[in-house]
C-alpha cells in the first residue's frame, strides 16, 4: 500500500513538473515547414514572407537567381530548391522559424528530414493545377508526422486558376477536410482580391509599393459572403464542442464572434480535424500577410507538440535534423531544441553513441547567412558549430545522467514497472522513443565515380563523406570486384547535382560512369542446405555447422524453424549467437547473384546450428553469409525492375503522339483527364529502364508544350526477354 501511495505521489509531482516546464516555453514561437509540388511557388512565397517581415530589403525572385533560401549555385542556376534551408523572422509579435523544402522527387529526403523539426506546415498548391503528384507525396509525409497544416492556393491571379477544383482535389485526392477562410474575387481590370469569410471583408493589394500595404473594406451586407460565413461556422461547430455550445445557446450564427471562430478553427487545426485554406498570388505580392497571420493564429506552439520530452525537465534535449558544410565554419548542425537551454561552450552527449562534443558557437538561421548568439531556448531552431561526429537523427542531451533520468521518468509516467535488467530496457526506450532516424528511400540509380587523378582519390572520398553526411539518401559504397567507388541516388538530377557540387564546392572534377538501374532480386524457388566449416586460424580451431533455408516471404526476414526436431535446440541458443547468425545471414541478401541487386521478399529460416568452443563471432557471421550466398545460387533469383508513376500535361493536339511513344516504352496508361479546354493530363506507370532521356524526348514530341513529373511507385517482375537484356546491360555486354 505504501509503495502504491508513493507511486501515486511521484506521478502527481511529475505532472506538476511538466506544467512548470510548459510555462518555461515561449508561446511566441512557430516552427513551420513549407511543402509543395515543384514550381507551385513555394520559394517565392517564402521570399515574400521574408520581405514583408522586414528580414530582406528587396524581393527575391527565383528567375533572377537572387533568392535567400535558394542559395546554392545549382539552385539559382536551375531555379529549383535542392537543399532545405532555415530562416527566422518576426511577424506580429511571433518568432517564425521556417524551413523551405525541395519540391522535386529526387530530393524528397530533404523534406523527410525537415519534418522532424517542425510543428506545422504550409502546403502550397498551384491554383492552375490543384493537387499534383509530389503534393500527394509531401502530404503523406506530413500525415506520418501528424502535422497540422494550412493550404495556400497560389497563382490565383492567373485566368486559368480554379479555386473550386483545388478544394475538390483536397477532398478527393488527399482525403482532407478543407475549411475555406478566404475566397477569390477579381475587379473589372482583372486584379485579384480576397474575401475574408470570418471578418466579412474584402482585401485589395496596392501594386505600386510591392504589396506592402493592402486595404480592407467591410462587406456586412453581402448575402453571399454571409452564407459562406454561416457554412464555415456550421462545419466547425460539428467538430468543436465549445463552438457548438455557443451556437446552441445563441440560436444564431450571426452572434458568433470572429474571435470564437478563430479559437475553434485553431483547436480543430491543431487536432488535425480540418485544414484551413487561404489563397493569393505570391509573385504578384497578394495574400502573403494574411497567410502569416494564419500561421500565428492556427498552427501550434512548440509546447503543444513533443510532450513526450517533458521527461527531461529543465535538462537540455535537442534533435538533429540536418547537417550542412560551410567553407569557413566547417560542419554546421541544425538542431530542434526540445527542452532546456542551449549555451555556447556547452558539452552535449549523443544518446545513440554516448559520445560527448562541445558546441563552439550557436547561430540563428537565415539560409546561408548566420547571426551568432550566446544561447537559445527550448522550442527554437539553432545552428551549432563544433559538432564533428553528430549525424542526422541523433538526440543530444546535457549528460548521460540526464538521459537516464529522462528515460526513467518516461517509463514511470506511463505506469511501467522498472525491470531488473534496467539498462537493457532503457536502451530499448531510448531507441523507440528518442530516436528520429529517418527512413532512407531505396536508390533508383547507381553509377561509378572516379577522381581526375590518383592524387585526388583521398580528397574525393572526404568530399563524398561530407556530402553523404548532409544527404543520407546519397549511397556511397565500394565494389570489391571492380575496385570502384559506387554512388547510389534518387534520380538523374540527384546524380547530376552531386557531380556539380563536387566541382563547385570541393574543386574536384569527378567522372561519373553510365547510370545503371537499381534492380532488386527475389527468390526463384525455395532451397535448403547445410554448410560446415572447420579451420585453424592462428592456432585456434574455428568450427561451425549451419543449416539454413530460403523461402519466399514478405513479412519476416529471419525466423527459427518450428519443427519438433529443431525447436528445442533452437530455443536454447544464446541470444548473442542468434544475433550474430542473423546479422551475417541478412547481410548476404544485400547483393544478389544476378546483377548485385538487393534480395527482397525472402525469408531466411534457421533449422540447426552447432558452434565449436572458442569460435569467434566473426567466423560464425561469415559462415552464415556464405551459406545464404550458396542458397541464392542454388535457388536462383528473378529480377524486379523499378516502376515510375508519371504525370504528363500536354495540349490536346499532342496527345496521340505522346501516347504512341509511351506504348513503345512498355507503359501502362492509368488515366487520361481534361485540364480546361485545351490540355489533358495523362497518368501512366512505366519501367525506369525505358525512361532514359524521356524528358528530352517529350519536349521533342510536343514541340516543348508538354510538362511532366515522375516518382518511384514500386517494383515489378520482368518477363524473360526483358530480364535477359537487363542482365546483359548490367554486365556490360550490351
From Swiss-Prot:
Residues 27-303 form the tr-type G domain. GO terms for biological process: mitochondrial translation; ribosome disassembly. The keyword Mitochondrion applies. It holds the Pfam family EFG_C. Keywords: GTP-binding, Mitochondrion, Nucleotide-binding, Protein biosynthesis, Transit peptide. GO terms for molecular function: GTP binding; GTPase activity. It is found in: Mitochondrion. InterPro entries: EF-G-like_DII, EFG2, EFG_II, EFG_III, EFG_III/V, EFG_V, EFG_V-like, G_TR_CS. GTP binds at residues 36-43, 100-104, 154-157. Residues 1-25 form a transit peptide. GO terms for cellular component: mitochondrion. Mitochondrial GTPase that mediates the disassembly of ribosomes from messenger RNA at the termination of mitochondrial protein biosynthesis. Not involved in the GTP-dependent ribosomal translocation step during translation elongation. Belongs to the TRAFAC class translation factor GTPase superfamily. Classic translation factor GTPase family. EF-G/EF-2 subfamily. PANTHER family: RIBOSOME-RELEASING FACTOR 2, MITOCHONDRIAL, TRANSLATION ELONGATION FACTOR G-RELATED. This is Ribosome-releasing factor 2, mitochondrial.
Amino acid at each position: 500500500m505504501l509503495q502504491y501511495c508513493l507511486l501515486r505521489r511521484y506521478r502527481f509531482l511529475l505532472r506538476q513538473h511538466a506544467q512548470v516546464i510548459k510555462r518555461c516555453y515561449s508561446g511566441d514561437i512557430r516552427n513551420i515547414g513549407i511543402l509543395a509540388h515543384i514550381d507551385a511557388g513555394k520559394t517565392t512565397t517564402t521570399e515574400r514572407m521574408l520581405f514583408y517581415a522586414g528580414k530582406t530589403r528587396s524581393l527575391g525572385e527565383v528567375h533572377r537567381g537572387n533568392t535567400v533560401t535558394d542559395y546554392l549555385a545549382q539552385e539559382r542556376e536551375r531555379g529549383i530548391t535542392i537543399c532545405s534551408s532555415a530562416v527566422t523572422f518576426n511577424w506580429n509579435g511571433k518568432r517564425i522559424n521556417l524551413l523551405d523544402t525541395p519540391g522535386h522527387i529526387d530530393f524528397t529526403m530533404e523534406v523527410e528530414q525537415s519534418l522532424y523539426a517542425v510543428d506545422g506546415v504550409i502546403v502550397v498548391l498551384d491554383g492552375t493545377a490543384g493537387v499534383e503528384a509530389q503534393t500527394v507525396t509531401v502530404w503523406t509525409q506530413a500525415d506520418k508526422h501528424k502535422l497540422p497544416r494550412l493550404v495556400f492556393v497560389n497563382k490565383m491571379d492567373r485566368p486559368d486558376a480554379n479555386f473550386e477544383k483545388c478544394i475538390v482535389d483536397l477532398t478527393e485526392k488527399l482525403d482532407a477536410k478543407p475549411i475555406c477562410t478566404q475566397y477569390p474575387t477579381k475587379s473589372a481590370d482583372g486584379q485579384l482580391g480576397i474575401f475574408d469569410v470570418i471578418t466579412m471583408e474584402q482585401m485589395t493589394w496596392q501594386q505600386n509599393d510591392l504589396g506592402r500595404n493592402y486595404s480592407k473594406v467591410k462587406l456586412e451586407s453581402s448575402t453571399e459572403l454571409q452564407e459562406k460565413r454561416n457554412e464555415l461556422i456550421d462545419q466547425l461547430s460539428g467538430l468543436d464542442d465549445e463552438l457548438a455550445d455557443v451556437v446552441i445557446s445563441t440560436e444564431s450564427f450571426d452572434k458568433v464572434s470572429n474571435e470564437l471562430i478563430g479559437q475553434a478553427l485553431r483547436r480543430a487545426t491543431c487536432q488535425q480535424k480540418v485544414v484551413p485554406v487561404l489563397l493569393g498570388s505570391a509573385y504578384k505580392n497578394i495574400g502573403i500577410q494574411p497567410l502569416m497571420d494564419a500561421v500565428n493564429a492556427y498552427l501550434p506552439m512548440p509546447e503543444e507538440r513533443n510532450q513526450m520530452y517533458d521527461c527531461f525537465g529543465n535538462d537540455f534535449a535537442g534533435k538533429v535534423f540536418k547537417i550542412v558544410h560551410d567553407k569557413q565554419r566547417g560542419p554546421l548542425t541544425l538542431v530542434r531544441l526540445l527542452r532546456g537551454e542551449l549555451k555556447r561552450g556547452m558539452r552535449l552527449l549523443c544518446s545513440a553513441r554516448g559520445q560527448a562534443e562541445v558546441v563552439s558557437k550557436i547561430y540563428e538561421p537565415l539560409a546561408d547567412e548566420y547571426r551568432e548568439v550566446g544561447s537559445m531556448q527550448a522550442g527554437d531552431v539553432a545552428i551549432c558549430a563544433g559538432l564533428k561526429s553528430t549525424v542526422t537523427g541523433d538526440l543530444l542531451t546535457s549528460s548521460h545522467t540526464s538521459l537516464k533520468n529522462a528515460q526513467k521518468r518516461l517509463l514511470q509516467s506511463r505506469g511501467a514497472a522498472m525491470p531488473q535488467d534496467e539498462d537493457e530496457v532503457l536502451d530499448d526506450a531510448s531507441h523507440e522513443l528518442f530516436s528520429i532516424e529517418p527512413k532512407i528511400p531505396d536508390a533508383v540509380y547507381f553509377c561509378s565515380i572516379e577522381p581526375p587523378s590518383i592524387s585526388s582519390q583521398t580528397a574525393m572520398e572526404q568530399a563524398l563523406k561530407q556530402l553523404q553526411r548532409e544527404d543520407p539518401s546519397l549511397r556511397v559504397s565500394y565494389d570489391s570486384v571492380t575496385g570502384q567507388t559506387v554512388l547510389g541516388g534518387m534520380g538523374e538530377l540527384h546524380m547530376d547535382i552531386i557531380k556539380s557540387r563536387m566541382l563547385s564546392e570541393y574543386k574536384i572534377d569527378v567522372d561519373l560512369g553510365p547510370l545503371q538501374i537499381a534492380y532488386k532480386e527475389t527468390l526463384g524457388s525455395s532451397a535448403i542446405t547445410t554448410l560446415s566449416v572447420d579451420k585453424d586460424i592462428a592456432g585456434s580451431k574455428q568450427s561451425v555447422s549451419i543449416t539454413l533455408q530460403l523461402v519466399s516471404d514478405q513479412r519476416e526476414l529471419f525466423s527459427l524453424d518450428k519443427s519438433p526436431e529443431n525447436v528445442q535446440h533452437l530455443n536454447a541458443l544464446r541470444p548473442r549467437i542468434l544475433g550474430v547468425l542473423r546479422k551475417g545471414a541478412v547481410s548476404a541478401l544485400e547483393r544478389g547473384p544476378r546483377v548485385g541487386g538487393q534480395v527482397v521478399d525472402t525469408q531466411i529460416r534457421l533449422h540447426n546450428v552447432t558452434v565449436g568452443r572458442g569460435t569467434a563471432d566473426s567466423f560464425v557471421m561469415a559462415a552464415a553469409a556464405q551459406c545464404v550466398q550458396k542458397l541464392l545460387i542454388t535457388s536462383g533469383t528473378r529480377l524486379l525492375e523499378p516502376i515510375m508513376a508519371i504525370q504528363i500535361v500536354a495540349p490536346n493536339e499532342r496527345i496521340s503522339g505522346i501516347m504512341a511513344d509511351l506504348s513503345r516504352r512498355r507503359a501502362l496508361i492509368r488515366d487520361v483527364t481534361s485540364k480546361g479546354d485545351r490540355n489533358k493530363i495523362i497518368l501512366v506507370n512505366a519501367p525506369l529502364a525505358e525512361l532514359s532521356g524521356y524528358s528530352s524526348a517529350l519536349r521533342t514530341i510536343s514541340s516543348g508544350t508538354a510538362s511532366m513529373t515522375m516518382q518511384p511507385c514500386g517494383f515489378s517482375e520482368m518477363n524473360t526477354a526483358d530480364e535477359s537484356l537487363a542482365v546483359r546491360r548490367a554486365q556490360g555486354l550490351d
